[in-house]
């Protein structure tokens, strides 16, 4: 091998030559789109009797949570685009000293991580798109879950798309800890068994397809049909239907129905000790927006009595379940990700938006979970339940928004008595 050494003068000459051939910054970034989010949250909760569980993302005391996402998409020509997104979401600086944060200190040494990185190819003239790499999955069963996946979308006409996807691996950790975890069921006292099942849920590939219809034919009708196979875990299928009737320039009435079903694989059921079963979720609600007022009325039923069921793959999915309270869908027994027994809830909300884009609202949820599963470790989430929420929202601009809520969640179990959890979240978010 022949080694070549450059003198300092030669190295400077090479650097100068490279600089002369470099593109100006303005030209280099003209086909690059920058996106970002800066989010701050303050969260706190307190609970008596300890039967509700810590499934909710508001599981700490006096937590200051910071999340930063920075992304860029470069158009490299001929329909190809490259997207990358870095995220900082390790921060959970507790102002309250406990066993998890014994010194109550603020971490400043946590790194950014690569959250998304994918190649996108679009054939605009043919309505075809392809995305390959680490990306948000965007399914009805996930919220902002990331995975290494391939996704193809074909849009033959405006408002209608056909999608197919294959997920090779799922995100290891989510910032809000809302991936499925049997450790929070209070059913399996063996920690090693819990860990084995948790890793097993996301161990295998997922394949699926969807029909996506938005305002079909200008009728105000949306129809989304989904199917997916999470190998050796469950087969999922879902329908999300909605109709919107305009009542004016800014006023409307909307009716939405969601059905989610699945068939659990026998091998997964055996891991859980034969207490799992196929599940179904039904949710129906109507929403009206009129003269600054908004109101929602609906009902939801999911799960199966005395069985463990999977309803969503991460968080509450993306089928509009976030209109139901704030905490109740995360509580023990009624967690939508993996639940014990059958949960039936009725819910309502009302709000008013003042001039200046300040909104105040109230939410209420009543119902319960039918469940008699027990391990002698305590309540598994059965009994009567209710939640009452105060919402505050302020839209300073299209980029900067503030919101907060205060929730009171109640459980009433005949054996383990009454439990109450108070939770609060304050948030400021800037997006660009």
Which residues make up each language-model segment?
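Gram-negative outer-membrane beta-barrel proteins
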Residues: 42-48, 90-96, 138-140, 170-174, ...
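Solvent-exposed loop/turn segments connecting transmembrane beta-strands
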Residues: 111, 136-149, 170-173, 201-203, ...
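Short, flexible helix-coil linker/hinge segments at the edges of structured domains or between repeats
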Residues: 166-206
